[in-house]
Every structure is written in C-alpha cells, then in structure tokens.
C-alpha cells in the first residue's frame, strides 16, 4: 500500500492525480498505524513549516514519520515536507522540525524575487535509480522561499541555482526528498514518481 499523508495541509489533490495517472492505488490517511504499515509513504507539502509541524504533531504523525524512516520504509517528501525533515527552519521563529536529517533550512537570498515560483534546472550530483530516464539539467517546478542546507553533503542528490546553489533533492537510504513539486513538473515529474514507486514496490501496483 502507498500511504499519502494527510496532516491537514499539503498539495493532496495534485499528488493524488499524479499517483492515479501512473496506475497506482493509494490511501489518504492521517493514521500513524496505517502509515507504519505502508510499503511506501508520500509526505506532501504546501505552505508554512510551522503549520505543517503543528498538523503533524496534532495527529501523532511526527513520531510516525520518524519511526518509518528508522524502519527504512520508503518515503518521498515534497517541498515543505522535505524542509521539516531537518532540525529547524529559519521560517517563522526558527521553527523546530523533525530532526530526521541533520541541517537547517535557510531563506533564499535577498535581491531575488521571493518566493521562487516557476521552472528551474535540476543538476544531478549522483547516479541513482530515482533519476532513471530523467536527463541531467531538466527543469522542474518550484514554489518556495526557503531551502534546505544539509549538514552532510553526501545526501545531496541534486542542486538548483537561485541566487545560491541549493540542495533541491535529498537521497538518504530509502528516503527521497524534493524541494520542487514533481506532480507539477510534467512528464519528467511523473517519471520521478514512477522511479520512486519502482524502487519501493518493484513491479507491483
């Protein structure tokens, strides 16, 4: 089962449409038990990190997400879903986050149009199955004002330049996290979802 985490926010409809377009079944859930019994989990994200953390904590989903990563259950985290995996974010009043990944989340540099909203290039830093069939340098769709700064550069799977060369994709064991929105990124965004599901589920749908 694929679990799509419902914490009271996030880009649920477009993510759900992307999953359906690929022919996969999923369950929209806010149950920690269902999330921990899933074969793959998607943590979507739109909006403020503090609101996301409050939504997760109110349903006990913060602990469930920490546990699923500890169990090495495949997780795909998107946009704010990626940011809250780190220790804290500069958004708001240095909001404390999940601390699954070491590092913090910084604001994009002043002097640029913020938020970054639109297409930007993904520069692949490693060879990995998540990039299968996706040429290096393809544009993906971004909407964000903050970016993750991992303490361990070894988890940086791709970077993007917007005044600063920032981490736009994380790979850590079976955890994949993207600053961009694959569900809004056309055929290559769908391909990234497909690659994640293939890594998690094999040929099963």
Curated annotation (Swiss-Prot):
Any single Gene Ontology cellular-component annotation: cytoplasm
One GO term (biological process): L-histidine biosynthetic process
Entry keyword annotation includes Lipid biosynthesis: no
InterPro entries tied to this protein: Class_I_gatase-like (IPR029062), GATASE (IPR017926), Imidazole-glycPsynth_HisH (IPR010139)
Alphabetical UniProt keywords: Amino-acid biosynthesis, Cytoplasm, Glutamine amidotransferase, Histidine biosynthesis, Hydrolase, Lyase
GO MF assignments: glutaminase activity; imidazoleglycerol-phosphate synthase activity; lyase activity
Domain of life: Bacteria
Subcellular location: Cytoplasm
Associated pathway: Amino-acid biosynthesis; L-histidine biosynthesis; L-histidine from 5-phospho-alpha-D-ribose 1-diphosphate: step 5/9
EC assignment: 4.3.2.10, 3.5.1.2
Active site as annotated: 79, 181, 183
Catalytic activity: 5-[(5-phospho-1-deoxy-D-ribulos-1-ylimino)methylamino]-1-(5-phospho-beta-D-ribosyl)imidazole-4-carboxamide + L-glutamine = D-erythro-1-(imidazol-4-yl)glycerol 3-phosphate + 5-amino-1-(5-phospho-beta-D-ribosyl)imidazole-4-carboxamide + L-glutamate + H(+); L-glutamine + H2O = L-glutamate + NH4(+)
All residue ranges annotated as the Glutamine amidotransferase type-1 domain in the record: 1-205
A Pfam family per the record: GATase
CDD domains linked: GATase1_IGP_Synthase
Function of the protein: IGPS catalyzes the conversion of PRFAR and glutamine to IGP, AICAR and glutamate. The HisH subunit catalyzes the hydrolysis of glutamine to glutamate and ammonia as part of the synthesis of IGP and AICAR. The resulting ammonia molecule is channeled to the active site of HisF.
Oligomeric form and interacting partners: Heterodimer of HisH and HisF.
Family annotation (PANTHER family): IMIDAZOLE GLYCEROL PHOSPHATE SYNTHASE SUBUNIT HISH (PTHR42701:SF1)
NCBIfam families in UniProt: IMP_synth_hisH
Protein name: Imidazole glycerol phosphate synthase subunit HisH
Classification of source organism: Bacteria, Bacillati, Chloroflexota, Dehalococcoidia, Dehalococcoidales
